[in-house]
Structures are given as structure tokens and as C-alpha cells.
Amino acid sequence: MAVGPMTPKERFTAALTGQPVDRPCAASITSVVNFELMDLVGPHFPEANTDPEPMAELAASAHDVMGFDSVMPIFGIAQEATALGCVVDFSDPGNLPTPQYAPWADREAEIRLPEGFPDSFLEDKYVKCSLDAIRILKEHFGNEVMILGKVMGPWTLSYHVYNVQEFLMDTLADPDRVRRSLDALSEVP
């Protein structure tokens, strides 16, 4: 059955649901950003991780430059970490943001979400940056291109607030503490 021309968003959605498409869908559910693309388009890290305009411009290049059917403006996995009390280093232009301080790493630390949660989460400047970049992309593409977001689950968030090594070791050494972490972080929007 022949399918007529589709918008990138229609193509992505059809491919995702197993429906016929007008051509194979070219998409990535993760970031496609690399140094060559940053040089070509202009925005670089760290600005593209901390400022919604450069973030959106760099994300848009997945479609505008490379022809992908989707764009995704969140380039790393640490955006939520700051909202959960981590100190994240966004300064290295050659690397993705990295948590430098994990509030639950100390074995005596109380495993609980930050004061004011969930409102404080949505007001965090890096969470807002990501949401603003998505809004900018929506204005730029309208309903033509699939705009993807990224949400980390409790396991990945635990790496940030707990410390990766300690968290993984505690899956055996202190599984109750791991469960408390996963339970607390399951409330993150």
C-alpha cells in the first residue's frame, strides 16, 4: 500500500507504531550532537547545556542540517541532578555535564527529596532551561518535526544523588538503602 508524503513527525509516529511510512524514518531518541555539528551550527558546550537558545539551536540541527525526523535538546543525563541537590560541572566544553557532589553519598545522609519538592524541581534553572528549549523548538517546528524530551528514571537519578560506585555496591551491601533511594526518586516528575 502506497503512502503519500508525510511530515517528519507523522513519519516518526507511524514508524513507532508499526504503520506504513513514505520512507524509512531517520531518528534518534538520544542526542546526535558532536563537535563537528557544534562547529557547523555555532552553539557549543557548555552554553548549549545551560542556555535554552543555544540548546534549541543545536538540537534543531538534527533536523535542519542532518535531515532527521526528530530533535532532542537534552544532550546529557545530568539536567535533573541539580534539582535534586547535586553540584554539576557544566563547564567542560569537551564533555557532557558531570555531577561533582552527590547529596546522598554520605552513609549518614537522609534519603529524601529536596525542600519544596516538586515545585523546586520545576523551578531549577537547568530543568527550566530544558523545558524552555523544548518550547523554542515547538515554536520553530510547529507540528512538523517530532520533538523528544528525556526523563531519567529512579535508577539513573540514584547514580547522581547517591554516587554511582556506592549505589552499585549497595545493591548487594545495603539493598534497603537502594530501595529507599529508588522509592524516593520514583516521585520525580
Where are these regions (language model features)?
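N-terminal basic, low-complexity leaders that serve as flexible interaction/assembly modules and, when applicable
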Residues: 1-90, 132, 180
